[in-house]
Amino acid sequence: MWNHKDSYRVRNGIVSASTIEHPSLGLVFFPAFDWKISATHPERQERLLYTRDQIVEEGLLDVPNIREYNPIVADWDVIERVHVGAPDLASWVTDAHRVSVGGAIAAADAVLRGEVDRAFALVRPPGHHAMAMVHGIRGFCTINIEAVMIQHIRQTYGVKRVAIVDTDVHHGDGSQDVFYHDPDTLYISFHQDGRTLYPGTGFMDEFGGPQAIGANIDIPLPPGTGDEGLLKVMRELVLPILHEFKPDIVINSAGQDNHFSDPLANMNVTAKGYAELVDLLQADIAVLEGGYSVQEALPYVNTGIILSMAGLDYSCVIEPNYVEQHQSADVTRYIDDLILKWKDQWARREEIARDELIGHKNRWVRDYSVYYDESGVQEERRETVRLYPDKIGWHSIESYGNYGPYAKQSVYAMFIPWQADDATREEAFTEARRMKEQGGLNRYVVVDPMGQGQVEI
């Protein structure tokens, strides 16, 4: 388990990771050879084929401190403690999604049971664009793998403070959505600037909900960022924030599409750069997310990550098409300035939290839209957060989906926080029943993650 006191030391205000010599590593593979969005889609069957071949060819499964685990099929119950579907989850979730989630759960179990020090789930389909409400597929994602895994970890092992560090090139707007109102889950994403790449989100003002200011850290990086920039952000910004947050466990959403050869982005990171990034982070669990340079990047990036997590030498991991490139001076200056702005905002988080509540009594409301690019669904939402002076309140979503294969769908979903006491839980159910009496939506659902699970009202 991640320990900020033992794993990190502070020098001149910068936190650097110390290494555990040859930690044991669990690997879980689920390449989902029977699932694809389409035959030519980037998220297709052979995405992990070359990675598996590379790992076998390098003999990594024969290394004494590396152990392979089989995925499981995740139960519907644990998925429904995170997600609400329209018209229902079964309309969108396949067996492949349940096994992908189950692969992450198997990795977590191996670590939390003390069988290995760390684990890496190389699974697909990916999940970090999947939000709590599911009207279809967006950003290749339907179920949020890490979110369901975290629910399992909390429910089974009693872990409280969790940090997610998302190293995918795309902002993980789904993970942000699930945990935006949870002050005990720190979500950090550094990604290509949303003004230049899908999903167009992930900016500094997305700092967490009104009762969780500072629990959401979005670091939008300029196109052309290379190893130098990513490692600087990790050392000077991400690690110090983790040190202050003091998580019980750290999870890496290990997207690999920052690689210089990835066809869907414009970054300049190498396999060795990824390995060093992972070495600095010292995550307990890594879960594969994006990465679509199937032959030129994924086999080498994954090999580097495995070697790094197992405490082995990764200095010889070099892609066949590698050409040394240097990050431009303009990109470096931009990143330096961004780090300074973030340090200032992080230091002012309590002041920002107070300002956020000005004008709100016991409720905070926002309206926004979500587009499901793979399913053609346009969703309109009204989100309401119940504010208490001394505890975490529930939040609800009135969700209206239009177009797509199921035409018009509407759901009222009440989300009870996992930290809820009996009084909060009772009030949430009362509010959901009141909303149903008013009518107007197809379904009324309460999600009680540490209690009854998902309940139809």
Feature roles, as predicted:
Residues 2-165, 170-457:
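HDAC/HDAC-like amidohydrolase catalytic core signature
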